[in-house]
Design a protein with these regions (language model features):
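Conserved tyrosine-mediated DNA breakage-rejoining catalytic core shared by Y-recombinases
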Residues: 56-59, 76, 100, 109-145
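Basic, Lys/Arg- and aromatic-enriched nucleic-acid-binding interface segment
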Residues: 26, 30-34, 45, 49-104, ...
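Short, contiguous acidic/charged loop-to-helix segments that flank catalytic cores in large enzymes
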Residues: 85, 123-131, 158-167, 185-190
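N-terminal core-binding DNA-recognition domain of tyrosine site-specific recombinases/integrases
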Residues: 1-41, 46-48, 163-171, 188-193
Length: 199
């Protein structure tokens, strides 16, 4: 099949086939589709195809991996935050999640101007309830102030937006996963489960 002949229906059949034969976790399937969508976007810009059939593709429902998640233990947190493998952005994001319970997307979108009156002001989120204010813990204040610079508007510096929805968290989330794996943290310990480990 030539690339121009690939339709949205074929994309759907492909995703269904992966689910049936490999039964991947939802995140694994999502990342696979995002990678293919990126390839089609490249092909579209170079006029190899007339559209990207994977653009805003709705994933089929597969197995849920909620049971894989578990709160971070004190030892998990210590190993991660004291590791030489963890860069400054990973350290700051993890600290913010621990002290606030924020989602990774929210943390990646935080700007220095969103902090005033010792509060994080969150203006974007999945729901209206996501728009809220969260107290800035004194520990976080020291960490963020020490990382501040005049020419950087975001708290997490240098993140490159990616994925079909162009999120700053896309590549960063993958990096966090690779770091956890490198540290041999338990499989169920993921960034999202920091929301269940709030200090």
């Amino acid at each position: 099949v030539e690339i121009k002949e690939i339709t949205r229906r074929l994309c759907s059949d492909y995703a269904d086939s992966i689910l049936k034969n490999k039964d991947p976790a939802h995140g694994t399937l999502r990342n696979t589709i995002l990678d293919i969508s990126t390839l089609f976007s490249w092909a579209y810009r170079r006029e190899y195809t007339e559209s990207n059939p994977f653009y805003k593709f709705k994933l089929p429902v597969g197995r849920k991996n909620v049971q894989e998640r578990r709160p971070w233990s004190d030892e998990d947190i210590r190993r991660f935050l004291t590791s030489d493998f963890v860069n400054k952005n990973e350290f700051i994001a993890t600290a913010i999640a621990l002290y606030t319970g924020m989602r990774l997307d929210e943390i990646c979108m935080l700007k220095h101007k969103h902090i005033f009156e010792d509060l994080f002001h969150i203006f974007e989120g999945k729901t209206k309830a996501a728009r809220r204010v969260v107290p800035v813990h004194p520990v976080l204040k020291k960490i963020i102030v020490s990382n501040d610079s005049d020419n950087e508007e975001y708290i997490l510096k240098g993140l490159i937006s990616a994925g079909y929805d162009n999120k700053r968290s896309c590549n960063f989330q993958k990096r966090l996963g690779r770091t956890r794996k490198r540290l041999n943290l338990p499989k169920g310990v993921v960034f999202h489960s920091l929301r269940n480990t709030v200090i």
